[in-house]
Every structure is written in structure tokens, then in C-alpha cells.
Amino acid sequence: MSVQATLRGRRRAAGTLLAAGALALAACTPAGEGDGDTSGEPDASGAAGTTQLSIATGGTGGVYYPLGGGFATVIGEQVDGYSATVSETNASVDNMQLIGDGGADLALVLGDTAADAVNGEADFEGAPVTACALGRLYDNYTQIVTSADSGITSIEDMEGASVSLGSPGSGTEIIALRILEAAGIDPDSGISRQQLGVAETVEALRDGTIDAGFWSGGLPTGALVDYATTGEMVLIPHGEYATVMQEAYGAYYTETEIPADTYEGQDEAISVVVVPNVLVANPDNMDEGLQEQITAAIFDSREQLTEVHPAAADLDPATAGEVEYMDICPGSQAYFDGQ
């Protein structure tokens, strides 16, 4: 069955940096509470004399949430008249829907999900989303996790197992379904399909209620850092499927490696599929001047943001405008042109 039909050295510093990131977060709001229109005058939604922006992120156990909190901090510090808060969501699919319906002003999103959204494909079939990219951020590594005693050493070994494919409405779920398709496993009949976020996946692995789980995130991911300390975590290599996924869906899927020692007890590099992350906005709801100011605040603050999460070390204005699958926001392009 096709996925279209089915869907319709950093580890060591990670623990303290993720804790610091949590402390750096701006106040968190429920998904969908942004007004989605930042083209007008400041209003009373933020501090006195400021307009409050909503940033759609992901679950608290991943990278989007703390990094989005860092973005909120630098926006509040560097963009006059604006503050920002983060919203916990199921991540990429939810986030693009929030951008489309005005429920969020900014969102962190996987590149493949963003492409589906602007092209009206997969979960967005018949309902394309108007969006532009403020820039490419960092790569998401597909991390397929199991326990040492599961007997699973490859994707093929998952046949008949209980496997989490990520939260419903997440970019992880899209990637998981496409990897299984590339491996010839039907996600509806070939596995016992579960839908859990990364923190819940780790809990279920510890409890023995699932055999394996998919997660797409930056390196290192906090929930996996914690799980690796038990000595039970095993990462499953799968980078060989990147070529098939490129041919079927697009060039944003590539093969790379999770470096050895990214997680405790991980002695060897692991071949995986990666996909870039982008920060997106709705150009109908955000003027070019604000786009440029936000882009500058984020990409000029790489060192500060790296203290929130190590993935921010990959923020690079020299390559951030290289987004082939959707338009760059014109204000962001102006910033990149000036570098």
C-alpha cells in the first residue's frame, strides 16, 4: 500500500544544555492560540506595547520545543515591538496546518512535510498551504530505536513487531511510513502500528509494550540521551533506503551517519536517512520587514542558540537559503543577500 494512501562530541553536553534550554523557554501556549496576523499594529496580546508571536514546535522530548524557545528569546530581545511564545504540538503536519489556518505565526517543520503542504499532497491533498521558508535550519536524523534484547537489527526484522511510527500528525510518521514502504513492509498489516511521541516511545520501550520506535530529530535528542544511559538502547541502520525515497518523493531525503558516541554506548556510526528542517511563515500574514528581522535575529544568534540546543550549531546563513522545495520568504532572502 502506498504511503499517500496510508497517510492521506554533542552527547556529553546535551543533558545540561537541554536543561538550560528548558529554562530559557518563553511562556508556553496551547497550539492554535496565536492570532496568525503579524502585519498590523502592535496589540495587547504580548507585553505592554508589543505584539506576541506564536511559534509552533513539537513535543517536549524533542528538539523543536527547546530550540523554538530559544527562537522566542532572541525574537523578544532583538525584534522591536514583538515578543514570542512557543506552542507544544505534534510537530510538522500539525504545524503546517497551524500556519495555513492562522493558528501560528512561525513553525518548525520538516522539509518533506513542508513540500507536501505547499504542493497540496499527502495529508494536505486538495488543501495546499500558503507558506514560505525563513530558512533551512539543521538536518533531522531518522533515529530508529529498539532495545538490546528485542532481536531487531534491521528494518526487515520489524515484520510482525509492535512499532511506534511517531505521533499522529508528525513529520516522523511521514518518514516512518516511507521507510517502511521502501523496505517492502505494509504499515497496516506488516507491523502492529503504534503512534507515540519520542518521550512516550522511550517509556514504552522501557516497559516492553513496543519493540521499536521511529523518531526524526536533531542530534542529540534529549529523550534518547536519557534512554541511552540505561545501556539498553540500540539504533537501527537504514540509510540504504534514501535512494528509493529520493526517487519516489524528492531529493530532500539523503543518507548520512549518526556519528559514533553521539549517544552513550553507541560505539559505531549508524547509517540513517536525514531530511532538513525549515522555519516557515505565511507570507500573507507576515510582512517582509518582520520576516527579515526575525531571520536576522535567529541566524545572527547561532552561538546563543547553541547554548539552548547543540543542533543550532548547524544554523548557517550561507546555506540557509538553499530550499528547493518551497519559496524563501522575500524578507529572509533580503537578509541572506546581505551576508
Positions of predicted regions on the chain:
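Pocket-flanking alpha-helical
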Residues: G69-V74, T85-A127, I144, A199-A204, ...
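An extracytoplasmic/periplasmic, membrane-proximal ligand-sensing/linker region
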Residues: E200, D207, G217-L235, E240, ...
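Bacterial N-terminal signal peptides that target proteins for export
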Residues: S2-L18
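Bilobed "Venus flytrap"/periplasmic-binding protein-like clamshell domains
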Residues: Q52-Q78, Y82-V86, D139-D207, E322, ...
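Bacterial signal peptide processing site
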Residues: T29-G32
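Pocket-lining segment of extracytoplasmic ligand-binding domains
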Residues: G111-T113, N119-F124, S150, P187-N285
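Ligand-binding clefts/hinges and TM-proximal coupling segments of bilobed small-molecule sensing domains
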Residues: A161-R178, Y252-E324
